[in-house]
């Protein structure tokens, strides 16, 4: 963002209204390829000899100044051969540069909001692990959860209409329409595991930006409506006692009105609604009843249809009780379970045993989906039996061990918040034995021989994962096996979900 502020010496109104001329600036394409202001080589194409250098960027800008060169007829035999051969390359470059340009208004709003709230270190807020401490603090007091998938637009014009509220430049919107109708692969970009064309693989930044803008517009309206419908707003710690007394008044009102107005009881209850989203999946949890959650379910369906013309099937929204069901979110199976405890109370010569049950938020590693992900990556079969992976002959044994160990450390780092570490131990066992089978396949030897020769080294590589990432949190723990049974630890440096853990 510093590069934007350095080069874009325009006030905010100009940046909102005149974004299209920036498509003719060379530094935009340098920023699009994350090379800062390095003007040497911007992109290596997956083709045979195509390289997008500064010369190609200048050639592209010259052609864009000419008329009718952005839209090329398919059956035009008189078109320039060089432009026809590089049509996909030019289109890719323009779309990536355009993605950088349309992100400018959103980036400026983000900087202004962070400066207004005096948030100096905002990187910790980006960690996806910061969601789980929020779950621990709030979900143990809630009853029901809505597990839903956010629908995506079925018509590309809806994306353009949504972006009109943020980008006021008509020329930029017309260019956006050109890309959207030129490459009709929106559904494949929502699920990037099944890309339908090479363009979708290389130009996901633009389509991810459009999807995030669509979700941002939906959430801004949705949060506003939730705040308007909530009777009890979140208060600061100074008014905490007043809120406790108000809860007591609510319970008294419920007892009074229970006999006369049983239908309107839910109006006096604080719904205490919480909303969390990651990618296309969102969670809504409430302290209310199942009737209230059903009302929210059909309200969301009507909200998507009326305001955004999106059809969402009721079967895509599940209502589960937290005490009886677990929900799959960000690679964890999360639930609220009762932790029974017995307390002995003694008064004078009499003693009493009091059964007490405390709600506790529980997170476990889903072993079956993880084994399925490892099977797709060819680390094991569908039953979890480790197999060897084909590797290049020029890789050394230390490189192979380091690659397997890095994967194992990433697993341990991401799933450090699991309540039960035995599933994580099984994943490590699969990776360790798969590494041994890979080495044995390379040297055309037996697995027992390599386990006997490299047993201690493999053991240190695969079981020292927590010791390397937790040296300050648990300095007294020395045994490598004790790391498998530690408590939950959440990190603030994880910005994306593990690829093998993203089994949804």
Swiss-Prot record:
HAMAP family: MatK
Keywords per UniProt: Chloroplast, mRNA processing, Plastid, RNA-binding, tRNA processing
Pfam families: Intron_maturas2, MatK_N
Entry's localization field: Plastid, Chloroplast
Family: Belongs to the intron maturase 2 family. MatK subfamily.
Highest taxon in the source lineage: Eukaryota
MF terms (GO), sorted A to Z: RNA binding
Residues passing through the membrane, by range: none
Native organism: Aucuba japonica
Its biological purpose: Usually encoded in the trnK tRNA gene intron. Probably assists in splicing its own and other chloroplast group II introns.
Gene: matK
Stretch forming the signal peptide: none
The UniProt record lists the keyword Transmembrane helix: no
GO CC, one annotated term: chloroplast
Origin organism lineage: Eukaryota, Viridiplantae, Streptophyta, Embryophyta, Tracheophyta
PANTHER family membership: MATURASE K (PTHR34811:SF1)
Name of the featured protein: Maturase K
GO biological process, one term: RNA splicing
